[in-house]
Amino acid sequence: MRHHYTGKVRDLYEVSIDRMLMVASDRISVFDVVLPDEIPDKGRVLTGLSAFWFDQTAHLWPNHVVSADPTDLPETAGPEIAGRAMLVRTTRPVRLECIARGYLFGSAWSEYSEQGTVCGRPLPAGLRQAEQLPEPIFTSTTKAESGHDETVTDAEAAALVGDDVFEQVREATLRIYNFAAAHAAAQGVLLADTKLEFGVVDDELLVIDEMLTPDSSRYWPAEHYAVGGSPPSFDKQFVRDHYLTLGWDQTPPAPAVPQAVIDGTRARYVEAYELITGKSFDEWFGPDS
């Protein structure tokens, strides 16, 4: 296998002309900066939860997964990547990050509280932080090779990737979000928002990268949800909140991650996996599989 690319969290290896091995590390990033410390088992959680959601949503939109079973991985792949690796189809990435928002939070809340809009789109007056939106909305950002992604309007996104591709990614993102939000709610979890990525192969648009993980989504425990603040979460908002207290300017290098934040993040990720899949994380593939 030949190393192809290293991202903030994942490493890609070329297996053949049309197959890649995608390996999720335990690295974690906030504000587009990779932190100096890792979260144990994080890569396995991301892969396990992605595998679950890719399987559950395949009837809604096709995806790039070939297999996450260690027995299907290339013989040159070592046992240490079991549970954190997927064999996937090679695609040409669409240069957008596609976001479905069901609740008013994060950067969407920041813009709304100042301007009454989200990505330039007017929303009803009087909404509060973390409030459920009248209906889920689609927003997008550019996919930057380095540095910060930039929010774009629907018109700018369509100009960037073409009208047809834009309409497809918008439809797929909202379709998947609505399905996943309903499933999560039945498990006592609110899916506040999520980010999806897409790629094209043989003129077919596929969902790629990860799906509905605590890295790419905001998950809130329904029993503790309240409008007007920052709900407890099963995602990396816990890490973001810590770094927001430090006065850090969000440029590398980032300060070290305290052990309490490392342990708390791992616990939240594992809990998200178990609540959503209904399975013990101990059952997911690991180095001893």
Regions found by a protein language model. Give the residues of each.
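Active-site loop/lid in soluble adenylation, ligation, and acyl-transfer enzymes
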Residues: 1-143, 250-256, 260-289
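A long amphipathic alpha-helix within ATP-dependent nucleotide-binding catalytic cores
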Residues: 161-192
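C-terminal helix-cap and adjacent tail motif
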Residues: 211-272, 276
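Generic recognition of stable, solvent-exposed alpha-helical segments in well-folded globular domains
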Residues: 44, 48, 164, 168-171, ...
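Catalytic cores of nucleic-acid ligases and guanylyltransferases
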Residues: 25, 47, 81, 179, ...
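A short mid-domain helix/strand-loop element embedded in enzyme catalytic domains
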Residues: 132-163
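Conserved metal-phosphate-binding beta-hairpin within the catalytic cores
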Residues: 100, 191-211
